[in-house]
Design a protein with these regions (language model features):
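Class I SAM-dependent methyltransferase SAM/SAH-binding core
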Residues: 20, 25-69
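Conserved class I S-adenosyl-L-methionine
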Residues: 112-137
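Short alpha-helix
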Residues: 136-150
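A short glycine-rich, Lys/Arg-flanked "PGG" loop and its adjoining helix->strand segment in the class I
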Residues: 95-107
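Conserved Class I S-adenosyl-L-methionine
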Residues: 150-223
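Conserved alpha-helix/loop element of class I SAM-dependent methyltransferases that forms part
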Residues: 1-17
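A conserved beta-strand element that flanks and buttresses the S-adenosyl-L-methionine
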Residues: 81
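Short catalytic micro-motifs in class I SAM-dependent methyltransferases
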Residues: 84-85
Length: 223
């Protein structure tokens, strides 16, 4: 089951209708949720990402905003989703971002957080371009602290490995640059090293070479 299917299954099983996509990027998750019949509001601090998302998903509502200061009233949403976005929030603001997501939930709502672990083939090949070890660990520590403080609770997190088809080093660089265009220049400077790491870590999947990335999903409800 892919990540998007996991999220939509959770939302639909919970009877969610109004969903906030926090850190939406170019709108990939928003597009999927709209197709599934959900009412989607999405935020991202990058105006260019929001502009691209609005063009791609005209049936969702998009706002330029940071996760640490959501411009919504309490009780506005049935669910909030951080899909690979919490670790992009500045570390000192991660806890506030989680509190904000809990604040805007309706009674019975939940916050879904999906984060990549600081391990695995995809991560190892990416490290010369951007080593996210510390920020990924900080995101998980923020979630753990929230639960330890008795602010939120939820079932044990789910962990799985996501395969990403990447035909070659060039395709891998393209994949990284789609998330952050600034990565391309760094990746090009590290092309020889990336090619070596790609050869060491890529495995053959049903559609050609792929790199796997372990992911973890939390479901958090306010206490």
């Amino acid at each position: 089951m892919d990540t998007g299917t996991r999220i939509t299954t959770i939302l639909k099983d919970a009877g969610a209708r109004d969903v906030l996509d926090i850190g939406c990027g170019h709108g990939a998750l928003a597009r999927l949720l709209v197709r599934e019949g959900l009412a989607v509001t999405a935020i991202d601090p990058a105006p260019d990402a929001i502009a691209a998302a609005q063009e791609t998903v005209p049936d969702a509502q998009f706002t330029v905003a940071g996760a640490e200061a959501l411009p919504f009233d309490p009780g506005s949403f049935d669910a909030c989703v951080f899909l690979n976005s919490l670790h992009h929030v500045p570390v000192p603001l991660m806890a506030q971002a989680l509190h904000e997501a809990l604040r805007v939930l309706r009674p019975g709502g939940e916050v879904i957080v999906v984060e990549p672990l600081a391990e695995g083939p995809f991560f190892e090949v990416m490290r010369p371009v951007e080593d996210e070890t510390e920020i990924r660990r900080a995101a998980m520590a923020a979630i753990d602290a929230l639960c330890s403080a008795g602010v939120a609770t939820g079932p044990a997190p789910q962990t799985w490995s996501r395969p990403t088809p990447v035909a070659n080093t060039e395709a891998f660089i393209d994949t990284l640059a789609r998330v952050d265009p600034a990565r391309r220049a760094v990746a090009e400077a590290q092309r020889e090293r990336l090619a070596d790491l790609f050869a060491r870590h890529a495995t053959e999947g049903p559609n050609g070479p792929e790199l796997c990335q372990p992911l973890r999903l939390w479901r958090l409800r306010p206490i």
